[in-house]
Amino acid sequence: MNFRPLHDRVVVKRIDAEEKTAGGIIIPDTAKEKPSQGEIVAVGPGGRDEAGKLIPIDLKVGDRVLFGKWSGTEVKIDGKELLIMKESDIMGVITDVGAKKKAA
């Protein structure tokens, strides 16, 4: 990717939601909500405190994260639809993604 976010910003690629419910009902595109889950594809260096000291970001490329429905700014970079958001817009990191898929 030819983009490097500045300060405490990250670039997130949305992860599409399931197209079927647990009961097997197919959800049409018009009824789907925007996914609030994504994968970090780029990370800025971090913010600065009042003394000018760098505060590194606690996220890394490849992390799967949860964020608010209206978080970030939608952009198109290299033909891909991505979100640019501040680290503070991210609610948390999903850990152990592989175990969740095995249980389903």
From Swiss-Prot:
Cystine pairs: none
Domain of life: Bacteria
A single cellular component GO annotation: cytoplasm
CDD domains: cpn10
Localization per Swiss-Prot or TrEMBL: Cytoplasm
Assembly with partners or alone: Heptamer of 7 subunits arranged in a ring. Interacts with the chaperonin GroEL.
The protein's name: Co-chaperonin GroES 2
Organism (species): Rhodopseudomonas palustris (strain ATCC BAA-98 / CGA009)
